[in-house]
């Protein structure tokens, strides 16, 4: 069973699923943030728009792609999967590479859609002591969401 799972994870199809899922999530998070900024100056409304878009796209890509690759979509999720011996070191490194490429592709896509420079630094200054706390919480939320969905078999019935 473990050999079968490893073979499935090492397939081209699994790698494409990780690339595509990560790209879609990145494009949605970045693009919905850009769209929200265009819609309103109200920061609370911007965060709400971004959060709603992120939640729905995350549910969708987990539902669609978990059966193909495991729906890891983030190196932090892979670290947890590796520590739980759900994936091999080889899968960890190969998925990390395709996820990074997918994240870049998603960012480029979002920038292109909103007619911004395809590659460049963020125009939003993000600093302050609470930034690292918010990143840790967001990453922990992503890890929990993916593993709860996968471990409880919800990747197949996220929408009911």
Describe these PLM feature segments:
Residues 1-160:
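Membrane-interface helix-loop junctions and terminal tails of multi-pass membrane proteins
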């Amino acid at each position: 069973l473990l050999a079968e799972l490893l073979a499935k994870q090492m397939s081209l199809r699994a790698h494409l699923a990780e690339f595509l899922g990560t790209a879609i999530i990145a494009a949605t998070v970045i693009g919905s943030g850009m769209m929200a900024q265009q819609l309103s100056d109200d920061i609370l409304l911007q965060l709400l728009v971004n959060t709603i878009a992120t939640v729905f796209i995350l549910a969708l890509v987990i539902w669609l792609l978990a059966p193909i690759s495991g729906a890891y979509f983030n190196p932090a999720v892979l670290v947890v999967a590796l520590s739980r011996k759900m994936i091999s070191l080889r899968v960890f490194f190969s998925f990390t590479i395709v996820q990074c490429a997918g994240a870049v592709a998603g960012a480029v896509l979002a920038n292109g859609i909103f007619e911004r420079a395809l590659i460049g630094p963020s125009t939003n200054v993000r600093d302050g002591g609470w930034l690292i706390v918010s990143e840790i919480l967001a990453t922990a939320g992503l890890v929990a969401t993916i593993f709860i969905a996968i471990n409880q078999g919800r990747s197949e019935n996220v929408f009911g």
